């Protein structure tokens, strides 16, 4: 039985992020929030286990340095509650909803608990409409569904964060609705960059109305905060969906850190690990989060989640568990990034539920499959090329290889958010221009253009202009 709010306890043991609290009366419920004060600031603890008759084991949401045994703790009586609604827009908050942008308190009228049930099956809605991103390789080969769940998979340093930033930039700017960005266990510098990028593009307006709220629990935070910050962001997105009936964009960078923090917490709680050292509740934890990210009859949540792939192994339990929940998967490949092709999306490994002629139309489907076919053929010929050289190929195969190399380069694209590094301005390409360009490429219409003309351009007209410039320079 749970204790009434304000049950009093005292700290009996502190081991890193795990704090044991003794209560004389009834114990607080599992997932209840407890609060104490550490060096003058509020510290929230979340109940994880009941030990014996009068002790609970809790996970701290902030550093436990400075806590002492015997220190008083009070039970709030509910799970962690965070501010939701329009007051959160344009603000940066931490896992417990406190502002960390030095712009005063968040004056929200409504607070909601971060733990909630997923919407009932009958309330869920599915629609199959393409969400155009302006990024050629995504729109053509693994189109995103409005109200769907999208995963960006990649190892260390292949461009997940740059791609998610570009998606925030392209979609959140054009998108009239609200967006929520949850930074889970990633670099503080990137969080800071995103904030300033959003201010520059007026998605966050410091004086007027903003369209995005940010929730950060970065790499330096204890595991309790990293394991819960995605739920804090999701709670804010759910409010806009359920109460205000809005279509919401929900970005998470990085969902792997949520799993990683869960694994750290699990080890601290003394649970026996499962495969590769992950927590035994890996699938349950992931399911509890992912099932809440869905579209209902009231509104939709379209989520884009970056998923770090440890050691580039897609069969690792953490990325493998998240695959099952997604509508579209965009896989980033180190071999492609080594060729200097960015975004380094693997055109043969990336999939989408809506790449279907009934949804995207016959022409789009045929062109996408044609592109994949030509790239697959090139992949099969690479062994022969490596051993015998290009000269041993048949004439048809030589044409296929030449086209495939152009297709590969045409799948690259300069990004707005990378402009400071590359010096070339970013471009967004309309879906019809993307289809037109690739249709011409695979049918041989542009066989006369040189390969470099297709690298880091937007639509096919830009490639033609670049080819003319290259020829003029060579003359």
From Swiss-Prot:
Its family?
Belongs to the ATPase alpha/beta chains family.
Q: Where in the cell is it found?
A: Cell inner membrane
- SMART domains with a match to the protein in the record: AAA
How this chain assembles, per its entry, is: F-type ATPases have 2 components, CF(1) - the catalytic core - and CF(0) - the membrane proton channel. CF(1) has five subunits: alpha(3), beta(3), gamma(1), delta(1), epsilon(1). CF(0) has three main subunits: a(1), b(2) and c(9-12). The alpha and beta chains form an alternating ring which encloses part of the gamma chain. CF(1) is attached to CF(0) by a central stalk formed by the gamma and epsilon chains, while a peripheral stalk is formed by the delta and b chains.
The keyword Cell membrane appears for this protein: yes
TM regions (residue ranges) = none
Gene Ontology cellular-component terms for this entry are: plasma membrane; proton-transporting ATP synthase complex
Question: Which CDD domains would you find in this protein's record?
Answer: ATP-synt_F1_beta_C, ATP-synt_F1_beta_N, F1-ATPase_beta_CD
What Enzyme Commission number(s) apply to this enzyme? 7.1.2.2
Annotated membrane topology: Peripheral membrane protein
Q: What does this protein do?
A: Produces ATP from ADP in the presence of a proton gradient across the membrane. The catalytic sites are hosted primarily by the beta subunits.
Class of enzymatic activity (EC top level): translocase
Q: Where does ATP bind?
A: 154-161
Catalytic activity, reaction form: ATP + H2O + 4 H(+)(in) = ADP + phosphate + 5 H(+)(out)
Please name the gene that encodes this protein: atpD
Q: Matching Pfam families, A to Z?
A: ATP-synt_ab, ATP-synt_ab_N, ATP-synt_VA_C
Protein's UniProt name: ATP synthase subunit beta
Xref: NCBIfam families: atpD
Keyword Cell membrane included in the entry's annotation = yes
Q: Which InterPro entries match?
A: AAA+_ATPase (IPR003593), ATP-synt_VA_C (IPR055190), ATP_synth_F1_bsu (IPR005722), ATPase_a/bsu_AS (IPR020003), ATPase_alpha/beta_chains (IPR050053), ATPase_F1/V1/A1_a/bsu_N (IPR004100), ATPase_F1/V1/A1_a/bsu_N_sf (IPR036121), ATPase_F1/V1/A1_a/bsu_nucl-bd (IPR000194)
Q: Extract one GO molecular function annotation from the record.
A: ATP binding
Protein origin, superkingdom: Bacteria
Keywords, in A-Z order: ATP synthesis, ATP-binding, Cell inner membrane, Cell membrane, CF(1), Hydrogen ion transport, Ion transport, Membrane, Nucleotide-binding, Translocase, Transport
Its main subcellular localisation, reduced to a broad class, is: membrane
